[in-house]
């Protein structure tokens, strides 16, 4: 997974953001100009159109973004399901643990677990009024 932190951020400077995937990641970059390219656009980034491997460039001071690239083989007549994991955590270790936990789960199971957790939180208090 690609982890990022902005210690200069006033509100969430201590948090760690992450971008991971359910499938192997082959290259990454945090340089927006590398991804979009000189003549590309956000709709048609040159790195995607050219099938280019990303450099792994992750440096402060650039125009930041988070890009992960993977080579995916889709069999003739087949399909492939891809999931990306985007979130934040208190520490890099917690971010890595979240990615590992969710990378191995089926997407439908993650949705069911998420709904169960929210139901446990939201259904705790019930209010009845005469109106």
Protein language model features and the residues they cover:
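Trp/Gly-enriched beta-strand surface patches
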Residues: 1-76
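Residue-identity detector for glutamine
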Residues: 5, 46, 100, 109, ...
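Terminal amphipathic helices with adjacent charged low-complexity linkers/tails
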Residues: 88-111
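An acidic-aromatic substrate-binding cleft motif
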Residues: 104-131
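Short helix/loop capping segments that flank catalytic or ligand/cofactor-binding pockets
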Residues: 12-13, 27-29, 82-84, 91-96
């Amino acid at each position: 997974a690609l982890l990022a932190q902005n210690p200069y951020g006033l509100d969430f400077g201590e948090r760690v953001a992450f971008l991971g995937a359910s499938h192997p990641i082959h290259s990454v970059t945090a340089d927006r100009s590398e991804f979009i390219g000189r003549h590309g656009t956000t709709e048609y980034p040159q790195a995607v159109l050219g099938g280019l491997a990303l450099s792994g460039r992750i440096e402060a001071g650039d125009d930041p973004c988070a890009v992960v690239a993977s080579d995916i083989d889709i069999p003739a007549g087949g399909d492939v399901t891809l999931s990306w994991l985007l979130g934040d955590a208190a520490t890099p270790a917690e971010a890595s643990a979240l990615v590992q936990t969710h990378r191995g789960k089926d997407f439908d199971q993650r949705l069911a677990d998420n709904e169960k957790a929210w139901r446990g939180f939201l259904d705790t208090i019930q209010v009845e009024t005469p109106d």
